[in-house]
Swiss-Prot record:
GO BP term (any one): alanyl-tRNA aminoacylation
Gene3D superfamilies: 2.40.30.130, 3.10.310.40, 3.30.54.20, 6.10.250.550, Bira Bifunctional Protein, Domain 2, Threonyl-trna Synthetase, Chain A, domain 2
Keywords for this protein: Aminoacyl-tRNA synthetase, ATP-binding, Cytoplasm, Ligase, Metal-binding, Nucleotide-binding, Protein biosynthesis, RNA-binding, tRNA-binding, Zinc
Main location (coarse class): cytoplasm
The keyword Membrane belongs to this UniProt entry's keyword annotation: no
Top EC class of this enzyme: ligase
An example Gene Ontology molecular-function term: ATP binding
E.C. numbers: 6.1.1.7
Organism: Chlamydia felis (strain Fe/C-56)
Protein name as it appears in the record: Alanine--tRNA ligase
InterPro entries membership: aa-tRNA-synth_II/BPL/LPL, Ala-tRNA-lgiase_IIc, Ala-tRNA-ligase_IIc_anticod-bd, Ala-tRNA-synth_IIc_core, Ala-tRNA-synth_IIc_N, Ala-tRNA_ligase, Ala_tRNA_ligase_euk/bac, DHHA1_dom
Residues bound to Zn(2+): 561, 565, 663, 667
Length: 875
């Protein structure tokens, strides 16, 4: 694969020039709610550019996996209809953090273009900002001035936000030749097809203030990005990014599955392109831990999947198919991104389940659309509200709604539809903004010295001082007795909630007062917030204090965290290598672990998992921790790490017997400290995600004791020895089953006896028999059974109506024999005639239907209505 070669050579080029090769960050940013998905290589370095984070390197290079399908950068609707729009792409990049600047960045880019990309230097063009004389002069060392163009802020100025770091940028373009347009320069090439941009170099040299002024940054940075798919297309000489390398491979697999050819019909070309691109987006997102859902990122993911299905229908797919394409993707990209291989079964399971659900929704939506069309008897217009509901709730695409409406000479109120869609998007945008603002901004504005020093791995108390106090969203100088607030300390033994572990509680005290810590959080890196209340006295900023963590609670939390690691490893050993943590939570009372697995775990496997964890507890292994460079363990198969998590340069490895994980949490000293481990329950929390809840130590002992007491109580009730309980229960169930069978047979005889009498009361319209009978509420659950039995006795020319009352409402059930259906009679039409005047509701099929209403006409009136309806229908 050319993409694998290019990626590898690009990274090697910069590594040989003292750049750290930094792994791609997750497809979604963990600590940046301002964007839905990672959409550029610089996202993971944002805090470095903002001077909020320091790293051990000043130069870096990456191949970043990106998705642009939501928010400001949203290419979703264009994918499939242009030559180069993608929702998923890889961004090659090199970065300098206060190290080299324009001169070296431009020299590197030129050398890479010639030696790595093997571009003809005579076909390379550059653009610079109109005011960037320095960049222009530097490019003149490599290019004639007539191939360097000055452009405005619109094209060649980059900013992270309205204020903050920003700077000029320079783009590199490749002339693909006259076959791609008649333009003779990038200025004439308005669609960018001939002179194709392949690399953008951003020079962060300014800080934009609120009044728009540009101030020079004390430390200048470089951020570059080159789209890998676009480079592959240029080098391969293809017209589009879809005709080369990985994307063409996925299109070929789709051709094989569909039996259609990509270039056979241009009208179908978009479908092949959409499926190839969307399969990549979905696979990488699921591998990083995202799942389709109804909000934010999950909603976008579901939208991508459903768009794939909609286009797949154009190729003849009527059942799930995406999972069959994924192995081709894994074969081509799994070496560079091992998370794809590890998550293959999970990706396929999620895709298939989502597709099945969507096909069901489409079927329901189609039926609902038919109802909408039939109910619009006075108009030939489907309301915008109905159309939007069909799309938003049931997933029926607008184009399918419009096509089906056209078959009935209906049209759709598009103006209202688009307005509702706009309002829904605005609500979604506001929800995202609300989520973004949820992090208390006060902590960003505090003037603090160095980050809070955490000493809690080894010490549970220390002497320190108060750096800041926050109360009711603002910084204050002191807290009085009974006042609630948050303290920030110079150093702390309190563990802040993160990594699935709950934060510590305890006390902070001084000569003037005591502050009871209820919980501890870390809203931003390096800051530990101690939340609580002054129980007596007062505390002031800069005051010397003594801290004391609740030792007993911390011990239980630490034991449970170690238990979570042991459980994770036991799951993998029992169920297979596909097991991946999808979330966890540990506190002082329980363990909760979410993990990837396609089905419920059998009781036998759960027992094996529990036994294995307890075996490791009895072996009493020392729990060891060590710090090491992430680069030394990133490819280790023995040490568990979680794709989707972002790790720093130095990581902490926790080893407990057979378990080895990257983890920053607190742990037991020995596995034997856990005492005992019990699983409480196992259940599904999402498609392909299971959850186990468990306990250790005293809680596990209490559970075992309760189980023992329950068994004693059951034995007493059954009047059976404990070792005979199971046998006794089996006998009882067999007896109950036999009794139920006898009751059912007796009920059937009684029903047939009643029906024999009712047959004599059937009325006639021409040669059609019809019956109306009211059942008592106690028999309301047997409406359909009565109807079916009667129609077995009289299989033709029969219509029956059965009514009853339930919870104050009238229930009515209709059944029509098959031969009358062939003459055009339908059970649901009959109920419509009967219930519409009463304001009732109904639904069903041709052969039977059911409805309800607050009131019904008297039996004579029902007889007359039924008689008239039959006469009209048959005549």
């Amino acid at each position: 694969m050319l993409s694998n070669t290019l990626r590898s050579n690009f990274l090697k080029f910069y590594a040989n020039r003292h750049h750290a090769i930094v792994p791609s960050s997750p497809i979604f940013p963990h600590n940046d709610p301002s964007i839905l998905f990672t959409n550029a290589g610089m996202n993971q370095f944002k805090d470095i550019f903002l001077n909020k984070e320091t790293v051990s390197y000043s130069r870096a290079t990456t191949s970043q996996k990106c998705i642009r399908a939501g928010g400001k950068h949203n290419d979703l609707d264009n994918v499939g209809h242009t030559s180069r729009h993608l929702t998923f792409f890889e961004m090659l990049g090199n970065f300098s953090f206060g190290d080299y600047f324009k001169k070296q960045a431009i020299a590197f880019a030129w050398e890479v273009s010639l030696s790595v990309f093997n571009f003809d230097p005579n076909l390379i063009y550059a653009t610079v900002h109109e005011k960037d004389d320095e960049a222009f002069a530097l490019w003149e060392q490599h290019l004639p001035s007539e191939r360097i163009f000055r452009l405005t802020d619109k094209d060649n100025f980059w900013s992270m936000a309205e204020t903050g770091p920003c700077g000029y940028c320079s783009e590199l373009l490749f002339d693909r030749g006259a076959n791609f347009g008649k333009a003779t320069s990038p200025l004439e090439d308005t669609d960018g097809e001939r002179f194709l941009e392949y690399w953008n170099l951003v020079f962060m040299e300014f800080n934009r203030t609120a009044d728009g002024s540009l101030l020079s940054l004390p430390s200048k940075h470089v951020d570059t990005g080159a789209g890998l798919e676009r480079l592959v297309s240029i080098i391969s000489g293809t017209n589009t990014v879809f005709e080369a390398d990985v994307l063409r491979l996925l299109i070929s697999k789709t051709e094989e599955l569909s039996g259609k050819k990509y270039h056979e019909d241009e009208a179908l070309g978009a479908a092949f392109r959409v499926i190839a691109d969307h399969t990549r987006s979905l696979s990488f997102a699921i591998a990083d831990g995202l799942l389709p859902g109804n909000t934010e990122r999950g909603y976008v993911l579901r939208k991508i999947l459903r768009r794939s299905v909609n286009y797949g229908k154009r190729l003849g797919f009527t059942k799930p198919f995406l999972a069959e394409i994924v192995p081709s993707l894994v074969d081509s990209m799994g070496e560079a991104y091992p998370e794809l291989r590890l998550s293959l079964s999970q990706i396929q399971e999620v895709m298939t389940t989502e597709e099945e659900n969507y096909f069901k929704s489409l079927h329901r939506g189609g039926n609902l659309l038919q109802q909408v069309l039939k109910s619009s008897s006075t108009s030939s217009l489907i309301s915008g509200e109905d159309a939007f509901k069909l799309k938003d709730t049931y997933g029926l695409p607008l184009d399918e709604i419009a096509l089906l409406a056209k078959d009935y000479n209906f049209s759709v109120d598009l103006e209202t539809f688009y307005q509702l869609e706009k309002e829904a998007k605005e609500r979604s945008r506001k929800n995202i903004a609300k989520s973004q603002n949820a992090t208390d901004a006060i902590y960003d504005s505090l003037s603090l010295g160095e980050n809070s020093e955490f000493i809690g791995y080894n010490d549970l108390s220390c002497d320190t001082f108060i750096e800041a106090i926050v109360s009711e969203g603002k910084q204050v100088s002191s807290l009085q007795e009974k006042e609630k607030g948050a303290l920030i300390l110079k150093s702390t033994p309190f563990y802040a909630e993160k990594g699935g572990q709950i934060g510590d509680s305890g006390e902070i005290f001084c000569s003037d007062g005591t502050f009871v810590v209820s919980h501890t959080t870390s809203p931003k890196a390096g800051i530990v917030i101690h939340h609580g209340e002054v129980s007596q006295g007062q505390l002031s900023q800069a005051q010397a204090v003594t801290t004391q963590v609740n030792c007993i609670r911390r011990k239980r939390i630490s034991n449970n965290h170690t238990g979570c690691h042991l459980l994770h490893k036991a799951l993998e050993m029992t169920l297979g290598d596909h097991i991946r943590q999808a979330g966890s939570y540990v506190d002082d009372s329980k363990i909760r672990l979410d993990f990837t697995h396609p089905k419920a775990i059998s009781p036998e496997d759960l027992a094996s998992i529990e036994l294995l964890v307890n075996e490791k507890i009895r072996e009493n292994h020392q729990v060891e921790t060590r710090n090491t460079l992430y680069s030394d363990v990133v490819n280790s198969k023995e040490i568990k790490q979680f794709f989707g998590d972002k790790y720093s340069d130095v990581v902490r490895v926790v080893s407990a017997g057979f378990s080895h994980e990257l983890c920053g949490g607190t742990h037991a000293e020995f596995t034997g400290d856990l005492g005992y481990f019990r699983i409480l329950k196992e259940h599904a929390v999402a498609t392909g995600i299971r959850r186990i809840e468990a306990v250790t130590g005293k809680e596990a002992e209490i559970l075992a004791h309760q189980d023992n007491e329950d068994l004693n109580e059951i034995a007493l009730i059954l009047q059976s020895p404990r070792d005979q309980i199971l046998h006794k229960l089996q006998n009882i169930l067999e007896e109950k089953k036999e009794q139920a069978k006898q009751i059912s047979e007796l009920e059937t005889k009684l029903i047939h006896s009643l029906l024999d009498k009712l047959i004599d009361h059937c009325q006639q319209v021409n040669d059609v028999s019809f019956l109306i009978h009211h059942l008592p509420e106690s028999e309301s659950h047997r409406l359909q059974q009565y109807a079916n039995c009667l129609h077995q006795k009289i299989p033709s020319r029969l219509i029956s109506l059965w009514t009853t009352q339930k919870n104050g409402k009238y229930i009515i059930f209709s059944r029509i024999s098959d031969d009358l259906i062939k003459q055009g009679l339908q059970a649901k039409d009959l109920l419509k005639i009967l219930l519409a005047p009463c304001g009732g509701r109904w639904g069903g099929k041709d052969i039977f239907a059911q409805g309800s209403a607050d009131s019904l006409p008297q039996t004579d009136a029902l007889n007359n209505t039924l008689w008239q309806w039959i006469s009209t229908q048959l005549n």
